[in-house]
Amino acid sequence: IIMDIKVDNIYAFKDFHINMSYPKKIVNSTIENEFLEERTNFRYKKVNIIMGTNATGKTTMGKLLMLFTNYLNDGGYKRFTNRIADVKKAAKLQIDFVTNENLLYRFEMNVGPKAQKSYTEEDVDIKIFYTPIETRDSYETCASRLDMYECEETTYEKVNTNGWKFSYPIDSSGDKVYSTIEENSKYI
């Protein structure tokens, strides 16, 4: 369950933030049980509709979530550095999420401006923190603990994503018979 996303300088996202929690109980909601099982104060939006006109970032949001979930499967950082919009500036990605355990995780990635021809592992600082979700906790309570670093740190291998997988049509074929914008010199 994705709870919160903050992005800066990745793809075209600049100082972007979306939160998918409910601080207060919604009365007469048409969607039932928008909370964690046995954690009724930990509320989240089960349905999120991303709308917008052409070229407003809807597909790019999906691609960003794909990068994140695939990172949790293999720990490859280059998938992020290849999507930094302005290499002269720092880039940041922060995602709060819950798996099938009663833990709130925070993925934090900070990438400094590119100092060499390509990014190295030292340029990319990725940390994953977590805090237990206690019976009476809300998302806001747990996020506050993460903000104050009253939490534990872990690695991507130890996050139980229970097989999260995300693919995109461009990834489905090894024999590509089409070209992408990135490969066409008439596009910047």
Role assignments for model-derived ranges:
Residues 2, 15, 90-92:
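Exposed beta-strand and adjacent loop surfaces of beta-rich binding modules
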Residues 7, 95-101, 128-132:
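Short acidic, glycine-rich loop/turn motifs
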Residues 1-8, 186-188:
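Extended helical coiled-coil dimerization/tether regions that scaffold
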Residues 43, 53, 63-115:
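Conserved P-loop NTP-binding catalytic core
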Residues 20-25, 110-116:
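A short, sequence-level motif marking secondary-structure junctions
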Residues 2, 13, 121-125:
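A broad structural signal for short, well-ordered beta-strand segments within beta-sheet-rich domains
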Residues 112-188:
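Electropositive, glycine-dotted interaction segments
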Residues 4-66:
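Pre-Walker A-like glycine/lysine-rich segment at the N-terminus of P-loop NTPase domains
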